[in-house]
Amino acid sequence: MATFKDACYQYKKLNKLNNAVLKLGANDVWRPSTLTKCKGWCLDCCQYTDLTYCQGCLIYHVCEWCSQYSRCFLDDNPHLLRMRTFRNEITKDDLENLINMYNTLFPINQKIVHKFANIIKQHKCRNEYLTQRYNHFLMPITLQSLSIELDGDIYYIFGYYDDMHKINQTPFSFTNLISKYDILLLDSINFDRMAFLPLTLQQEYALRYFSKSRFITEKRKCIKISHFSDNILDNLHDPNFTLQVIRNCSNMSVEWNEACNLIRNINDYFDILKSSRTEFYDISPRCRMFTQYKLKIASKLIKPNYVASNHNSLATEVHNCKWCSINNNSIVWDDFRIKNVYNDIFNFIRALVKSNLYVGHCSSEEKIYESVKDVLNVCKENEWNILVTEMFNQLEPIKLNDNNYILLNYEINWNVMNVLINSIGKVPKILTLSDVILILRIIIYDWFDIRFMRNTPMTTFTVNKLKQLYEKDRPAEHDSGVSDVE
């Protein structure tokens, strides 16, 4: 049983504030939702279950029941998930405010314990204190959180997450922030709450508290493309494709870590809720993560023998050649930018091979083929530099005055020629390693300039950042006909 979900269900009946704040999709009537994919903890109701993707950030972090409310930890609306979400540097005062919010929403005192006990004992078989019937009382106040890093910003989603030992397929990792607070003070707060419970429940409460307040923080995970909705991958090769996200917004205007203070003034809180609205954003999928995904797919289709060939056709337009014809049916070629990069890269490398090595036909076996296979994987800069260096050395460079040089005296296409003129100022006949690296980078950067890309897509922006971009007409820029530089 999910303790946090049960606590929200029972405490929602206490008063008007709780009824508004503690409303969860997991406790309401189920509605059809998208298919679930991975195992993990729903950030909204904190239960461990099968997760589907959030409509606000497209990351898998919400269960099929809670997905009906489309809540995201990046929203600009004072729902419970947003008020439990803290960002970057967290102070002791911030944690104090969080604990006060917990005490306000989930109080334990003699009156409340007696009230719930009377309701539960109305049935003749419920005289004993069974944990499953009093589960809502067994949620201690801890500083347990799930954290995630999104392009330099670290988000902490506090809650009470059961079954921490289970498999976690999400990009969130368990973080214990008790070191930023006073351990003895937190113990005292929980012991005071526990004192109002019957003895049998006190023991279970204590066990849960110490297990969730003394655990070791996990190593933070790196977010991967598999953590995002599969719908993105299905359409990623369309240059006109945009990501559609839904955000819950309001007239809330507080510092990020102060959202939990809003319930202190109930009238002001309900005024903010009246301004709640849903906003839709169309966002470009342009980011380093998705670019690397597309380039990796293209890399798997590479036919390295083309660099030794005499074909007059571009690398993607060779037909009826056993060694050079690529699979043109792959969806990756729907993106004309990938095709342009592929053609220009291999036109340039072929010119280098023909200028420096004695090769006559694409059927020949050359050592340089191994280095060419991953030449598109520029997102991993260090590995890519090593790869290009190996390729350069296999071209049998001539050493003069501690520098190595190779020749360039074979024909190149107009696109590559323009790159050479723009980067070096002319079409050179002699190149160094740094020249080759520079030219290959420019060919790729002309369409996919990863130097200025975020690692994750803009779906992980806060609402304020999305609004700022919309004012500049930038978030939904289509990619057709323009490069990332433009």
UniProtKB/Swiss-Prot annotation:
Residues 82-176 are annotated as: Important for cytoskeleton localization. Keywords: Host cytoplasm, Host cytoskeleton, Host-virus interaction, Inhibition of host innate immune response by virus, Inhibition of host IRF3 by virus, Inhibition of host IRF7 by virus, Inhibition of host NF-kappa-B by virus, Inhibition of host RLR pathway by virus, Interferon antiviral system evasion, Metal-binding, Phosphoprotein, RNA-binding, Viral immunoevasion. It is found in: Host cytoplasm, Host cytoskeleton. GO terms for cellular component: host cell cytoplasm; host cytoskeleton. Residues 42-79 are annotated as: Zinc-binding domain. A motif (IKBKB-like degron (ILD) motif) lies at residues 479-483. Residues 1-81 are annotated as: RNA-binding. One of its GO terms (biological process) is symbiont-mediated suppression of host cytoplasmic pattern recognition receptor signaling pathway via inhibition of IRF7 activity. Its main location: host cell. A motif (pLxIS motif) lies at residues 480-483. It holds the Pfam family Rota_NS53. The C-terminal region is phosphorylated by host CKII/CSNK2A1. Phosphorylation of the DSGXS motif is essential for host NF-kappa-B inhibition. One of its GO terms (molecular function) is metal ion binding. Residues 317-486 are annotated as: Interaction with host IRF3. InterPro entries: Rotavirus_NSP1. Plays a role in the inhibition of host innate immunity by inducing the degradation of key host factors required to activate interferon production such as IRF3, IRF5 or IRF7. Associates with components of cullin RING ligases (CRLs) including CUL1 or CUL3, which are essential multisubunit ubiquitination complexes, to modulate their activities. Recognizes the host NF-kappa-B regulator BTRC through the presence of a DSGXS motif in the C-terminal substrate recognition domain. HAMAP family: ROTA_NSP1 (MF_04088). Interacts (via C-terminus) with host IRF3; this interaction leads to IRF3 degradation. Interacts with host IRF7; this interaction leads to IRF7 degradation. Interacts with host CUL1 and CUL3. Interacts with host BTRC. The integrity of the zinc-binding domain in NSP1 is important for degradation of host IRF3. The pLxIS motif targets host IRF3 for degradation; however phosphorylation of NSP1 pLxIS motif is not required for its activity. Belongs to the rotavirus NSP1 family. This is Non-structural protein 1. It comes from Rotavirus A (strain RVA/Human/Philippines/L26/1987/G12P1B[4]) (RV-A).
